[in-house]
Amino acid sequence: MMIDLDGHIEGPITVTRDTALWGIVTGDVTVKADVRVQLYGKVRGNLIVERGGVAVLHGAVSGAVINHGAHVVISGKAGSVQDLGDPPTQITRDAIVASRDDP
């Protein structure tokens, strides 16, 4: 069961349950393994997704989307993408990503 988070949240936060994030997080958001996040709001920081996690970004991340080997799809906006494991981040045609930084 997915929980909804809304409003203004002071981060950093670690997501340990399947979550739909609608609000604004000031700070980094870390998604743990085996957890799914649907991001419709904004992260004013980095979105860090651990191996085995799932993140679907419809909203915006002002910092980097850092993928440690998770299933990550960006259809919104991100400052940058860093793929640090497989599979690589999927970036849809409508997404806006300022830069991609693969090691």
PLM regions: where:
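Extended beta-solenoid/beta-helix repeat architectures
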Residues: 1-103
